[in-house]
Amino acid sequence: MNEKFHRIIFIIIAIAIAAVMFSLVGDYGSSIAEDEYQITQSIQLDRYYKSFGSDTSILQSSHPMYSGWFNALTVTMSDVFSKFEIRSVRHAMNALFGFVGILFAALLAKRCRNWRTASFTMLLLGFSPVIFGHSMFNLDDIPVFATFAASLYFAKRLADHFPKPKIIDAVFFALTSSLSIAANPDSSLIVAVALIICIIGLVAQRKHNEIKKAAIRYSIFAVCSLAVIFGIVILLIPQGISEWLGSFSPNAPTRILFEGKLFWTDLLPWYYNTKMLVMTIPAAVFVGMLLALGLCFVKKTNRAEIITFLVISVLAVLLFSLKSDTTGIWQHLLYAEIPLYIVSAIGFDMLVESSRTKATQIAGIAIPLLLMVMPAIHIFRCHPYSHIYYNEFTGGLSHAFGRYELENYGTSNREAAQWVIDNGKYNLSGNQLFVATRSEKAGKHYFGEYKYEVSIVETRWAERANHIWDYAIFPVTGIEPEILASKYFPQKNTVDTISIDNVPICLVLQRIDTCDLYGRGYLANNDVQNAIELLEMAVYNDPTNESAMINLIDANLRINNKDAMKKWIDRFLEIAPRDDVGNYYNAYYQNITGNNDEAERISKEIIEYNPRFSLAYMFLSMVYTLQKRYDEAENIILSTVDYDIYDEQAARQLVRVYNAQQKDISEAELSYYDYASKSYDRRGKKELAEKYKRLYEETKNKQ
C-alpha cells in the first residue's frame, strides 16, 4: 500500500482521536491544585502580561508556575468565551494542546520513517490512558508535552534540511523551545537534543562536499536560536531567572503512597520517577521498543533516530530524578515519554515492513492494535478517571491499590460533591449542611451554587473526627496503607464509593453519630470521664477512627491510667502500625514506664519513616538530655533544619540542652547558625546559607 493511502488512514485516526478527546473533556473534574491556586495565579499572570509588567501581584505567589504563559492564555480565552465557566475553557484548551502534542509526535515519526509509523504513533499516544487523561485537566504538564513534541519536530526538520537549514524551521524551533522551557525549565533539554540531532545529521553526511559550510550555517542558527529562546523566556517569566528557577523547588511537599509507604514528595527514592513511568506506560509501547531495538540492527535502518530518542528519554528522567530539589511528581515528566512512543511505533512499522506476505503484514498491523485494546477500553470504562492507570505488567489498579497513589489529583471531588447535592439529607446543625473535604477551596467551587445551604470544612482523613460535618468527601490519598488494606475499609458509614475497575478512589462518608466530636469537646474542657465514655463509643461505631483513639490515649494519660493508655495504643497501631502520632505516644509510654531503650528505638523509627514529624525529634532530644548524652541531644534537634522544621519549639529544646550543660545561650545560637549555614549550602540554598553564615559571624564577634 502506498504512502497516499497511509496518509488518509493517518488523517482518519487523527480526526477520530480529536473527536473523542473533545467529546469527553467536559466530564472531567478539576484538580485540587487548580482550585486552590492555579486559577488565581493564572489571573495574576494574565494581568502582568496585559499591564506590560506594571501589575506585579503575581510575584506574591509562592507556587511554581508550571505552564504559566498557557494558564494566562486560558484567562484571555475565557474572557472571549465568557458564556462558559473558566474551568471548562481551561480544560478544552488543555485537550487541544494534548492533541497538538500527539499530532506533532506523529508528524515527527513520519519524518523518521513514513505515514504508517505516524499512524502507529497517533494510536499509541492517543489511546495511552495517562496521556489521554492528563490532556483532559492537567494544565501543568500537557502544555510542556505539546511544545516539547513540536520542538523535537522542528529540530528534526533542521537536521533533515542538511546542508541548508531553513530559517522558518529555526524560527519555529526557537519559539516552541522557549514556550516549553518557560512552561517547565527541565525541558531545556530540548536545546541539547537539537544539538545532538544536528550533529548526527552532520556525521551521517561527513562525506558531503559542503560539510564545512553546513557546520558554519548550523552554528549560526544555533547561536541565533539560543538568543531568541533566552529572550522569549525572559519576556514570559515575571521574576528574575534565579527566582524563577527557585520557584520550581518544592516549597510545600506532601506525602504520597509509593511501594506501600508514605513518602514526602521531596524525599522519594531516586528511582521513583523511572518506576512510575514504566508502570503507567501501556505494555504495547515496550513491545514496540523491543522490536525497534532488535530490528534496527538487523535491517540497519533508523538506528540513529532510535538511539537518539532513547537517549533523550533516559537523560530527561535521570536529570529530573537526580535533582536535589525535585518535587518527585512523575507527571512532570510526561514530555519525556514522547520519544519512547515514537521508537515503539518505528518498531511496529519495521515488523510490518519485514513481513513477506500479505497475511503476515496484516498480523504485524494487528499486534499493536490488539495490545492497545485494553488501554483504550480503560479510557472509556474508567471515564472520567482514565489518567488513573497501571499497565498489564503491574497487575492493574487492583494490585496498585494500597501500594501506589491513585487519586492524588482529586478530580473525583466533582462526582462526590454532586452525590451530596443530590442525596444529602442528614443535617447536624439544623441550619447548614456541613461538608468536610481535603481542600476548602475545591469544596467551595463544587458547592458554589449552594453557599448559603452548605458550609465547607477542611480536614485530613486522620483528623476527620475532630471537626463538625454531616458528610465528608475523601479521595483515596494520604491514608495509611494498612488502613486501606484492613477489613474496616471502606468504613461502614460510607454512603457512596466512586470506583474504577472495582477499586475505590473516593469515599463519601455520612456522620452517623457525634460521640467523637463531643468526646473531644469534653476532653478540651478536661472532663476526662465523660470524654472517655463518648470516645469509646465512637471507636465502637468506627474501629478505624484514628482521632478518637488518639484522644482516648491522651485522656487516659491525663488520669495516669497507663494500662488503658497501652490498650488504646495497641488498638491504634493494629490498624496503623507506622502512624507517627500513634508511635509517638507509644514511645512516650515506654519512657514513662522506664523502658528508655525501646522509647529511643521507636522514636528513631518514627523519624526514619516520617522525617518531618517534629515531636519525635523533641522527645528524643529530651531523652538524650536526661541521660546526659548532650552531643546526641544537640545533633538530633539540629537535624530538624535539614527538613525545614526547625521552629520555636526546637529552639527552646536546644536551649534546654545547653542549660543542662550550664553553657551560655549564645553558644546554642552559634551552634544553630553554623549548622543551618552548612545545611542550606549542602542543599543548594545559597542565599539562606549566606544569611546564616553572616549571623554566625556577627554573633561570634559580639562575644
Question: What residue spans do the PLM features occupy?
Answer:
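Loop-to-helix entry region of an early transmembrane alpha helix in multi-pass inner-membrane enzymes
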Residues: 64, 68, 72, 80-100, ...
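Transmembrane-helix motifs of polytopic, lipid-linked glycan transferases
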Residues: 92-112, 150, 154
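Transmembrane-helix signature of polytopic, membrane-embedded enzymes
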Residues: 6, 11, 105-127, 164-168, ...
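Membrane-interface transmembrane helices that cradle and orient dolichyl/undecaprenyl
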Residues: 151-169
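Hydrophobic/aromatic-rich transmembrane helices and adjacent perimembrane loops
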Residues: 134, 140-145, 180, 189, ...
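C-terminal luminal/periplasmic domains and tails of membrane-associated envelope-modifying transferases
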Residues: 399-703
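Transmembrane-lumen/periplasm boundary regions of multi-pass, lipid-linked membrane glycan transferases
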Residues: 40-51, 63-68, 72, 79-83, ...
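Short helix- or helix-capping micro-motifs
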Residues: 121-126, 153, 177, 181
